């Protein structure tokens, strides 16, 4: 009877040991799967953030270009600034004024 008890305890112990090892491996596999899912989600978020940064960068460049047009003559100017750049075009009052100056200059010679 004693040998039967020993063998029964031995089988029970080995069965519980293998069961605990299997459960531990299962938990590790589940944690790995969760980590992979989390990494995939974070990669998707990173991809969306990169795309959003790209779109914002393009939008800001477009905004800068419209602002630069106000200040750079080769890109075009606002009509208020054109009056200060004679080669870009003059307002009608300035055209009249320059004609008068030209006539006065001819008379002075």
From Swiss-Prot:
Instruction: Report where it is expressed, by tissue.
Output: Expressed by the skin glands.
The primary location reported for this protein is: secreted
Keywords linked to the UniProt accession: Amidation, Amphibian defense peptide, Antibiotic, Antimicrobial, Secreted, Signal
Task: Indicate where the modification Methionine amide is found in the sequence.
Answer: 75, 88
Instruction: Please report the name of this protein according to its UniProt entry.
Output: Preprofallaxidin-8
Role: Fallaxidin-2.1 shows no antibacterial activity against Gram-positive or Gram-negative bacteria. Does not inhibit the formation of NO by neuronal nitric oxide synthase. Has no effect on splenocyte proliferation or smooth muscle contraction.
Please list where the region (Disordered) is annotated.
27-46
Say which species the protein is native to: Litoria fallax
- Give the location in the cell: Secreted
Q: What's the source species' lineage?
A: Eukaryota, Metazoa, Chordata, Craniata, Vertebrata
Please give the residues making up the propeptide in this record.
Answer: 23-46, 66-70, 79-83, 92-96, 108
Tagged with keyword Signal: yes
InterPro entries tied to this protein:
Frog_antimicrobial_propeptide
């Amino acid at each position: 009877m004693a040998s039967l008890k020993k063998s029964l305890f031995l089988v029970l112990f080995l069965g519980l040991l293998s069961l605990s090892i299997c459960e531990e491996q299962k938990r590790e596999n589940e944690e790995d799967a969760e980590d992979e899912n989390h990494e995939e989600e974070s990669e998707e978020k990173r991809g969306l953030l990169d795309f959003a940064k790209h779109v914002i960068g393009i939008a800001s460049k477009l905004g800068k270009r419209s602002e630069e047009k106000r200040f750079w003559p080769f890109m075009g100017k606002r009509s208020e600034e054109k009056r200060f750049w004679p080669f870009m075009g003059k307002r009608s009052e300035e055209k009249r004024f320059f004609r008068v100056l030209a006539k006065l200059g001819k008379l002075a010679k």
